[in-house]
C-alpha cells in the first residue's frame, strides 16, 4: 500500500475497512460518527473518505463507492485509489488499525491455541489491542478473494 495514503471509512463500509487494513492500508473508522463528522475528521488528518453516503458523493477528498457487493467494493476502491493489495499485506490489525509487530514465539505460548503454537514459528502482535496474528490466519483466504476479483 502507498504509505502516504490514509483512508477513513464510514459505517456502511466497515467490512471493506477491515479488509483494506489486512492489505496494509491505514484505515480509520468510527461507526458512531455520521458521514459528515467522519469527513471533517478525515480532512483534519489528511485522509480520503470512502463512503456509500450519496449526500457526500460530490465532496472533495471523497470516494463514493458505487457497489453494494463487498468483492466489487474491494476491487473498486483498490483500482480507484491505485492501491497495490500485495505490497504490504498483514502489517495492520484488522480490528483496530495499529501496526503489527513481530513477537517472539515463546511470548505467545498461552495466548494462542495449542495447535497453532505447535504448528507455527512466526507470530505478530497488534501494538494497539494486543491481538496475536500468525501466518495462515487470513492470507490464503485473502489471496483467493483477490485472485477471484482479478487483483
Residue spans of the language-model regions?
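Short, intrinsically disordered terminal segments enriched in charged and Pro/Gly residues
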Residues: 142, 146-151
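Flanking scaffold residues of small Cys/His-coordinated metal-binding clusters
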Residues: 87-91, 118-121
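Long, charged N-terminal interaction/targeting segments
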Residues: 1-88
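Short functional micro-motifs and their immediate structural scaffolds
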Residues: 98-102, 134
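Short cysteine-rich clusters marking metal-coordination/redox-active sites
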Residues: 93-96, 126-129
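GST superfamily/GST-like fold recognition
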Residues: 138-140
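Short, structured loop/turn "capping" segments at alpha-beta junctions
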Residues: 84-90, 101-104
Amino acid at each position: 500500500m502507498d504509505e502516504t495514503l490514509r483512508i477513513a471509512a464510514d459505517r456502511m463500509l466497515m467490512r471493506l475497512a477491515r479488509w483494506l487494513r489486512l492489505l496494509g492500508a491505514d484505515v480509520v473508522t468510527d461507526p458512531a460518527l455520521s458521514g459528515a463528522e467522519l469527513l471533517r475528521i478525515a480532512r483534519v488528518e489528511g485522509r480520503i473518505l470512502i463512503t456509500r453516503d450519496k449526500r457526500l458523493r460530490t465532496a472533495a477528498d471523497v470516494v463514493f463507492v458505487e457497489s453494494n457487493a463487498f468483492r466489487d467494493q474491494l476491487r473498486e476502491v483498490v483500482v480507484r485509489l491505485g492501491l497495490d493489495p500485495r505490497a504490504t499485506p498483514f502489517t495492520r490489525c484488522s480490528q483496530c488499525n495499529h501496526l503489527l509487530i513481530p513477537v517472539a514465539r515463546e511470548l505467545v505460548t498461552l495466548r494462542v491455541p495449542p495447535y497453532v503454537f505447535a504448528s507455527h514459528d512466526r507470530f505478530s502482535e497488534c501494538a494497539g489491542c494486543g491481538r496475536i496474528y500468525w501466518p495462515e490466519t487470513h492470507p490464503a483466504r485473502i489471496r483467493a478473494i483477490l485472485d477471484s476479483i482479478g487483483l
